């Protein structure tokens, strides 16, 4: 089995530990998962109480010194070692059982379909957490693929950010896109390593 590097940038997020544990516990090949975490928080997670702490490369930054997610993701990239795949996520996610095997198989299938370099990206489904943050309800109301595009007339307009909108793609299969969602990126490290995150953004 090939190795996956999971990049998690976090800013004072109470779900960070749940995210890490969900990824580990639901991975089919747990020994092949490595986490790179940059936590911008007053009180970091307690690594000593995590049974797989040797699989976590961790940096804690005082929130006063925080410079946003791109800065944190840039720092995380320096923690990559000999992994084969790169998964960049937000610090408030839950994972499906066997997600690691599913993603790698899906990536390999897509490679065969388009015969080109690629990244899998998108907005993960939302979920609701209970007060103790140990039970989650996944939003599964819409099951087809939604494409993402720019709003006409709002692309690089002075005084405005480039607004996006989603549209039904009328399929449950993936669609080619022109945008990347920073909260979920999966690819072969061979493709993602030449695209470093700019720590000045």
Model-based region annotation:
Residues 191-201:
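Single conserved hydrophobic/aromatic residue that forms the stacking wall/gate
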Residues 3-193:
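Catalytic cores of eukaryotic secretory-pathway lumenal/extracellular enzymes that build
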């Amino acid at each position: 089995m090939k190795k996956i590097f999971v990049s998690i940038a976090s800013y004072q997020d109470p779900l960070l530990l749940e995210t890490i544990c969900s990824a580990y516990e639901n991975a089919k090949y747990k020994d092949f998962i490595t986490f790179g975490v940059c936590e911008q928080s007053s009180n970091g997670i307690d690594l000593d109480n995590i049974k797989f702490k040797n699989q976590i490369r961790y940096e804690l930054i005082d929130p006063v010194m925080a410079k946003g997610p791109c800065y944190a993701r840039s720092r995380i990239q320096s923690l990559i070692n000999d992994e084969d795949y790169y998964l960049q996520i937000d610090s408030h996610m839950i994972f499906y059982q066997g997600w690691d095997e599913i993603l790698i198989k899906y990536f390999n299938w897509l490679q065969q379909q388009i015969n080109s370099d690629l990244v899998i990206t998108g907005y993960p489904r939302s979920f609701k957490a209970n007060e103790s943050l140990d039970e989650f309800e996944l939003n599964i109301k819409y099951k087809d693929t939604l494409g993402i595009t720019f709003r006409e007339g709002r692309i690089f307009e002075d005084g405005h950010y480039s607004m996006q909108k989603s549209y039904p793609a009328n399929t449950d299969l993936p669609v080619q896109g022109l945008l990347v969602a920073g909260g979920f990126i999966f690819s072969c490290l061979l493709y993602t390593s030449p695209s470093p995150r700019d720590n000045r953004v």
